[in-house]
Amino acid sequence: MKLIVNADDFGLSRGVNYGIVDAHELGIVTSTTMLTNMPATNHAFQLMEKYPKLKVGVHLTLSCGAPITTDCPTLINPQGEFRLTSQYLLLKEHGLSEEEVEAEWEAQIQQFYKRGVTPSHLDSHHHIHTWEPIIPVIKRLAQKYDLPVRTGFRNPPNGVRLWSDVIDAGFYGEGVKEKYFIELYEKFKAYDGTIEIMCHPAYIDEVLRQHSSYVEGRLKEFEMLTRIKLAEDVTLI
């Protein structure tokens, strides 16, 4: 069984950053994806240099913080922050400019290349890259930069490499239990492909509280990720 354990939200806050690198160093986290528009983004890039075995990709966002680009009126609220929330799927009319989304996401990706770093892969905050109106954008950017993308699409776009064969998002909230890993193993132990677990380990700080409604659960995830013992035939990649 081949397993990727990806920690989302690198760059969100220093507490999140330290929680992720410690969950990598002391636990089973193998990769992370970075929000490149947040207060602790520079801190996350600094930590990357200290943990070269930790794969780091881009956590594309339209729903956390403020955009990097300045000419994006369809993406922001009157305060200049992203106007979408995690409930974007409930919108009857999204009103987004595809051109503005593409320019913003390319700017987020470019934060890596400006520092001479190639990201490992692409995924997104609240899985928004799998939203039907956005899929043409993620396809073009993935092909332009030749980067694999987190799966989770209802119909994966042609010509896009996937980061894994399966994404399991059950390790969250009430699902953060040792039983989760037992059930995952039983389900996939004979599977030939690669499974990705999405997780959100963190130490709690005030910046995290300001930007996320999922707070205490992140510390619980950290504790589980640093103490769990996986079956001997599970290969972390």
Swiss-Prot record:
Q: Would the keyword Hydrolase turn up in this protein's UniProt record?
A: yes
User: By its UniProt entry, which Pfam families does this protein fall under?
Assistant: YdjC
Task: Tell me which EC number(s) this protein carries.
Answer: 3.5.1.-
SS bond partners: none
> What residues does Mg(2+) bind to?
59, 125
Q: Which GO biological process entries does UniProt record here?
A: polysaccharide catabolic process
Q: Which residues form a coiled coil?
A: none
InterPro entries, per this entry? COD_ChbG_bac (IPR022948), Glyco_hydro/deAcase_b/a-brl (IPR011330), YdjC-like (IPR006879)
| SUPFAM superfamilies, per database record | Glycoside hydrolase/deacetylase
**Annotated GO MF terms:** deacetylase activity; hydrolase activity, acting on carbon-nitrogen (but not peptide) bonds, in linear amides; metal ion binding
- Which co-factors does it depend on? Mg(2+)
Question: Which keywords fit this entry according to its UniProt record?
Answer: Carbohydrate metabolism, Hydrolase, Magnesium, Metal-binding
* Stored CDD domains: YdjC_EF3048_like (cd10803)
Q: Which family does it belong to?
A: Belongs to the YdjC deacetylase family.
| NCBIfam families with a match to the protein in the record | PRK02134.1
Known role = Probably catalyzes the deacetylation of acetylated carbohydrates an important step in the degradation of oligosaccharides.
Q: What is this protein called?
A: Carbohydrate deacetylase
